[in-house]
């Protein structure tokens, strides 16, 4: 009963702003007059939905985009769709495997600097699955892989003071106070895919605070969420939700808009999460303020990343 009441409150509060109606109210027909010529981008989760729209949007405005994804055929097809002066370079990588992510980061860094890094990949896993490295699949894909990619690019000198980091969170994080123990269940009996996903997305907010606390000469970071978008992930993970809200779900282009806008405008960093080119509070309910902070999250990610990449 408590869960049902919580869900009702959540949907009542966010149904309009997260829908296509909310996008039209805030962004409307405003275009994006941006020139990314000469910029090098890295986008994870590049072959579907929002990631694909970000890649195509950046390339059409002149960027060279390294598109990270697991499906080689989809990556190659995406590369052929580049328009304008930009290019799309496929980077085949399983973003749930930390050693593969570390390898990709090293290879990207060896090729030069990165102007925009978009942590877009995300998956909601209702069934408990572990990767060959012993990590829960959702945690590895949604959070630890972001950390490994970021750290690998930093160590390789690819990220610099002029770089932008944009993390694609989810409105689901509004219902979660960060709990480090809930980021990764140890077994199927204690796994809840919806709860874990919300935790991963809340953790992205804290990681953004951490990256912005590193001081001058470091990349600046923003965290955003796309609203409710009709993606393959929503179709497979939330079929009931999609059935109810399909008439007002956003397009992938709607979901990608704020990421492209942030990369173009580079607004001031600070607390908050971006939606539809506006900074909103990162807390809609008081209880989420009591969650864990980056001071606990970062050391945990660092240890787990080292174990996974070293094979220990």
Name each region found by the language model.
Residues 1-40, 292-312:
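Non-catalytic terminal and boundary segments that flank Rossmann-like NAD(P)-dependent oxidoreductase
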